[in-house]
Each structure stands twice: as C-alpha cells, then as structure tokens.
Amino acid sequence: MDKRWSLKGMTALVTGGASGIGYAIVEELAGFGARIHVCDISEAKLNQSLSEWEKKGFQVSGSVCDVASRPEREELMQTVSSQFDGKLNILVSNVGVIRSKPTTEYTEDDFAFHISSNVEAAYHFSQLSHPLLKASGYGSIIFVSSIAGVISFDAGSIYGLTKGALIQLAKNLACEWAKDGIRANAVAPNVINTPLSQSYLEDVSFKKALLSRTPLGRVGEPNEVASLVAFLCLPAASYITGQTICVDGGLTVNGFSYQPEEALLSRTSLRRVGEPNEVSSLVVFLCLPAASYITGQMVKPFVLMEV
C-alpha cells in the first residue's frame, strides 16, 4: 500500500472511543494500521469494545477516564506517553456532552458541565499532547465539533458555543503549531445515528424537519464521520490544516432550494419574507464613508435563514 494512505507505525489517542462516533473512529484508524489508546468514562463499555477489537486483531488499549477531571486527563496522558515511548501521531478529541434547553433555563451547573467536557478537556489534551505530537515528527489533531458550531441548530445554545470554540481552536493551533509539524482540523457532523442521538431521532417531528433540510434525505452513520477523521490523519492529507469539514448530508449548504412558502418561512429566523428596502438600506450603508473599513465582505440577503 502507498505509504500516503497508511497509518502503519503511527500512534493515536481517541477520547470517548468506546461507543458511537468514537468507536467508529477507532475502527477506521486501526484498519489503516495505527496503534491506538482509547479512553472512556464507562468501564463496562470500554472493556466490551476492547474485547471486540482484540478479536479483530486491532492494536487497541484503553483507560477509564472522566475527561472533565483535570487530574484524570493528566494521568491518562502519562499512560499514553509511557505506552508510546513519548511520541504520539494522532489526537482525536471526540468526547462531547449535551443538555438541550432554552437559553433562559440553563443553570451555572449546565454551563460548567458543557465547558469542562467539550472545551476545557479538548484544550488541555492539546496542551498535554503537544510535546508527544512534536516528538513524533508528524502530528495531527482532530476535534469532533458539530454543525451546531457552524450554524444555529436546535441543540442548545451552550452546546453550539462549545462546538464553535473547537472550530476556532483548530484554526489557532494550525497556525501556532505548524512549525512543530502538527496539523489541526475539525469535523462537524450533522445528527448521526448513535445511542446519544436516539432521543432526538425518536422525536418524529424533529426527525421530519431534520431530513427535510438535509439534501441527502437521511441520517448519517458513525463510519461516515470516521472515514473523514481517518483521512485527515493520513499522510495523504498532509497539506490540509486549520479546516472545518461538515459531514452533514448537505444540511449546512442548503440555504435555499425550492420549497413551499410555509417551508421557507419555517427556516427563516424572522418568519417572514424580506422587503426590497431592507436590502437597499444595507447597500446604501456600505457606500457611506461610515463603512470605510468594510471591504471584501459578502452580505447575504438570506443571512437570517442561513445562520
């Protein structure tokens, strides 16, 4: 096999890898020849998954870890460093938690819950893995974000905030750590068919609305996210960094395709059709001296529908 399309001899850490998208990512990376260490908060799920991978001949080990705990993160990275001789090629920050509520109902505990698991853990793991990734001579970080970090999505504002933060973190690290031979990218899935998303997919009205806005007309599968993650870790993707790629069946680009007016308005935040003077007022402003530092921007009349 062309070495550009192989991970043989490379090492990886996948957080939250015992089920769902994380499980699929482990299988994909292992299939390309990587040696992998997995962490998960559930010891039962982890042991079951490790047993399955052993039967398949994959080189996978694992540790129980609550990524929201700083001491446990540090202990995990010590284990990884020892196991892989101080070198790591791939970090996949996959763990994500969600509590869906209206913004006015979120509590301080809800905020801390999302930030510690979705943002702080990813940030700290990046810091801890930096010397190992640098030592490998070929490092790749993948943040599993969400379309909720790209567009407004009915999943809770705090969740969207945390997933958007991962996208920006990928951009920053891509620039800051390029000199160390480390790439950083994010993948942003739509709702994927995993145990975590079943409560949403069992909601008939939610699923109908979701699929009506997804051009491919179906829910994605975990291996459809995992295949992109694996590609971004391959030498074949060596010039791709700082990017966010949506794995969403086309949802985020479906700004306006023909549909009945009621369907159009259901996708428009203000729930009405715009007027010509609401566009012309912006055009006039952009021509004024007051807009003298605005240039090269694309202003979309349908912006409220597309966000």
From Swiss-Prot:
It is an enzyme of class 1 (oxidoreductase). It comes from the Eukaryota. NADP(+) binds at residues 13-37. Transmembrane segments: none annotated. One of its GO terms (molecular function) is oxidoreductase activity. Substrate binds at residue 146. The active site is at residue 159. Gene3D superfamilies: NAD(P)-binding Rossmann-like Domain. Keywords: NADP, Oxidoreductase. InterPro entries: NAD(P)-bd_dom_sf (IPR036291), SDR_fam (IPR002347), TR (IPR045000). One of its GO terms (cellular component) is peroxisome. Its EC number is 1.1.1.-. It holds the Pfam family adh_short_C2. Belongs to the short-chain dehydrogenases/reductases (SDR) family. SDR65C subfamily. PANTHER family: NADP-DEPENDENT MANNITOL DEHYDROGENASE, TROPINONE REDUCTASE. This is Tropinone reductase homolog At2g29340.
